[in-house]
UniProtKB/Swiss-Prot annotation:
Top-level taxon of origin: Bacteria
Catalyzed reaction equations: dCTP + H2O + H(+) = dUTP + NH4(+)
Keywords attached to this entry: Hydrolase, Nucleotide metabolism, Nucleotide-binding
GO biological process per UniProt: dUMP biosynthetic process; dUTP biosynthetic process; nucleobase-containing small molecule interconversion
Enzyme nomenclature, EC number: 3.5.4.13
Family: Belongs to the dCTP deaminase family.
Protein name: dCTP deaminase
Subunit and partners: Homotrimer.
NCBIfam families found in the cross-reference section: dCTP_deam (TIGR02274)
A matching Pfam family: DCD
Pathway this chain belongs to: Pyrimidine metabolism; dUMP biosynthesis; dUMP from dCTP (dUTP route): step 1/2
Active-site residues, Swiss-Prot/TrEMBL: 139 (proton donor/acceptor)
Gene designation per UniProt: dcd
Length: 190
């Protein structure tokens, strides 16, 4: 299983719609204002995805219990903004700007960007399995005792694409994975 390079990622994004919208290079400055950004777009061996303006932040207003088998949105407040302030030692869900369509012979691994990691924000994204498609639900943990700011429409994590030595027998789409074609921030369900 080998990691795929920028030329392959570009070709698959342009010809097969693997990533939409697709930034063909690392974007480090806002195209209109020139303001510095947390980079996103194509890199040497991956693609830095962006976080959208949609966030769901954990709150304890209703004294909810977090149960992955019976999750309730009472534990979350929805935010649509250019920034999201994650409270100390708290957690947020978000979604990617980009929509992904993963080929049958590819598996991805997603790693949080070092800019956020060095601020105590840990980004978790589960692998994109063969033939999975949708917007990515992104999990962000603020491990610090301070509030932390996350910027919408800027880079949040890097996606690495690995091509299998052989094609899998059953893809995510064929086994009717529960998060197939997710559109917004998708909460857990069993």
């Amino acid at each position: 299983m080998g990691i795929k390079e920028d030329n392959w990622i570009r070709k698959m994004a342009i010809e097969e719609g693997m990533i939409e919208p697709f930034a063909d290079s690392q974007v480090k400055l806002h195209p209109e204002t020139g303001e510095k950004l947390i980079s996103y777009g194509l890199s040497s061996y991956g693609y830095d995805l962006r976080i959208s303006r949609e966030f769901k932040v954990f709150t304890n207003v209703y004294n909810s219990l977090v149960d992955p088998k019976c999750f309730t949105e009472d534990a979350l407040i929805s935010i649509v903004d250019d920034v999201c302030i994650i409270p100390p030692n708290s957690f947020a869900l978000a979604r990617s700007v980009e929509y992904f369509r993963i080929p049958r012979n590819v598996l991805t691994v997603c790693i949080g960007k070092s800019t956020y990691a060095r601020c105590g924000l840990i980004v978790n994204v589960t692998p994109f399995e063969p033939e999975w498609e949708g917007y990515v639900t992104i999990e962000i943990s603020n491990t610090t005792p301070l509030p932390a700011k996350v910027y919408a429409n800027e880079g949040i994590a890097q996606v690495l694409f690995f091509e299998g030595d052989a094609t899998c027998d059953v893809s995510y789409a064929e086994r009717q994975g529960k998060y197939q074609k997710q559109q917004g921030i998708t909460i857990p369900f069993v």
